[in-house]
């Protein structure tokens, strides 16, 4: 007969949040840890395109590394193009940190983080509802019509 387990594990402190831009969806899994940030299994500074690297770093630069030092964030991103994916990732990271602080730290620091992010750029927390409009007949695009000739 097996001996009963003496050491009981406490539940893992984690939150799962998503960020969206156009058709790109990024899911961030945030748990207590040592400040590791990974996107699709790769470190944040290896995400392409290099031009948009600072867009990804914005939440970290705004809040400081000490806010991220106690958490590990894993992000998986699918769909959309390069730019949309970068915007979805930064939104997912920001929302994950706020959700973690609200659930496991305290409300005051969560509000402080949220105020800093919203003051800088609202799209860090709020999804952009704009979508591509479908093409209609009678023209080359959604709104443009073919040129009309009277002679």
Swiss-Prot record:
InterPro entries: Ribosomal_Su5_D2-typ_SF, Ribosomal_uS9, Ribosomal_uS9_CS, Ribsml_uS5_D2-typ_fold_subgr
MF annotations from Gene Ontology: RNA binding; structural constituent of ribosome
Keyword Transmembrane helix listed: no
PROSITE patterns linked: RIBOSOMAL_S9 (PS00360)
GO biological process entries: maturation of SSU-rRNA from tricistronic rRNA transcript (SSU-rRNA, 5.8S rRNA, LSU-rRNA); translation
Alphabetical UniProt keywords: Ribonucleoprotein, Ribosomal protein
GO cellular component, one term: cytosolic small ribosomal subunit
Stored Pfam families: Ribosomal_S9
Stored NCBIfam families: PRK00474.1
Family: Belongs to the universal ribosomal protein uS9 family.
Annotated protein name in UniProt: Small ribosomal subunit protein uS9
Species assigned in the record: Spodoptera frugiperda
The encoding gene: RpS16
């Amino acid at each position: 007969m097996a001996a009963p387990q003496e050491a009981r594990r406490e539940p893992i402190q984690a939150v799962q949040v998503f960020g969206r831009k156009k058709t790109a969806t990024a899911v961030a899994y945030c748990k207590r840890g040592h400040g590791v940030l990974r996107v699709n299994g790769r470190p944040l500074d290896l995400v392409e395109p290099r031009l948009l690297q600072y867009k990804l770093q914005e939440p970290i630069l705004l809040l400081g590394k000490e806010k991220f030092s106690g958490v590990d964030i894993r992000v998986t991103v699918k769909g959309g193009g390069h730019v949309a994916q970068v915007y979805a990732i930064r939104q997912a990271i920001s929302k994950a940190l706020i959700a973690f602080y609200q659930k496991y730290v305290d409300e005051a620091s969560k509000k402080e983080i949220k105020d800093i992010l919203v003051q800088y750029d609202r799209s860090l927390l709020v999804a952009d509802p704009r979508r591509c409009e479908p093409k209609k007949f009678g023209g080359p695009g959604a709104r443009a019509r073919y040129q009309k000739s009277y002679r």
